[in-house]
Amino acid sequence: AKLAQALGAASTAPALQAAQRPERPRGKLNAPKVCKAVGHLLPENAILIDEAITSGLMLNVMTQGAPRHDLITLTGGAIGQGLPNAVGAAVACPDRPVIALIGDGTAMYTIQALWTMAREGLNVTAIIFNNASYSVLNVELERVGAEEAGPKAKSQLDLHGPVLHFAQLAQGMGVHAVRTDEAEGFCKALEYALAHP
C-alpha cells in the first residue's frame, strides 16, 4: 500500500485477467497446442510438472484460466527432474491427478521413472515433447558466446540417431502410451489418460 501511494497508484484498480480456459485446439499438433489442450482439459486440484523446457513456453499462459492447480517447475541449471518429480508428487498426493510435461532430452535422463509409475500404479499422465534435440542447450551455447558450434558439438545436441520412439519405450515399461501429430488426437488421448489413472 505504501509503495502504491508513493508511486501515485493507490487509486488504480488492479487489472485482473478473466479466468477463462483456452479453446480446444485443432489441426496439426505443435507445442503451443499441447499447452492449450492441457489448459482446456486440466482438472481441478491437479499437479502440473513442467520440465518441457523450450516446448512448454506457453504453459503458464494457457493454464492461467484453468481450475485451481499446483505447478512444480524446473529451477534451472539442470535437467532430468521432471519424471521423478511426477513420481514424488503422485506418491505424496495419490488423490490428485499429476500431469508431467517433459522434453525429450530431459526424459532420457530419467526415463526409468515411467516403469516406477506403472509398477506403483501412480496417477501420472506424462506428456513427452519430441523435437529430437536438446534445444535448450543450443540456446545456452549462444548465451555463452559459442556463435557457431562445430559438427561434433552439434551432434551431441541432436537426438535423431537413433530415433527415439517414446510411446514404444513407455509401453515397454508397462505404461499405456500413444503418439499423435494432430491436436484432436492429442485431446482425445489426454481425456482418456485423465479418466483412466
Each PLM stretch: what is its role?
Residues 2-7, 19-24, 140-141, 157:
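Generic hydrophobic, helix-prone segments enriched in Leu/Val/Ile
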Residues 11-18, 114, 136-137:
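A general, composition-driven signal for non-globular sequence regions
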Residues 2-3, 30, 34, 182:
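Internal, well-ordered alpha-helical segments in soluble enzyme and binding-protein domains
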Residues 1-16, 190-194:
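Glycine-rich, acidic loop regions that bind phosphate or pyrophosphate groups
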Residues 14-90:
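Active-site diphosphate/adenylate-binding microenvironment
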Residues 1, 57-197:
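Thiamine diphosphate
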Residues 12-13, 35, 121, 163:
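Alpha-helix initiation and N-capping motif
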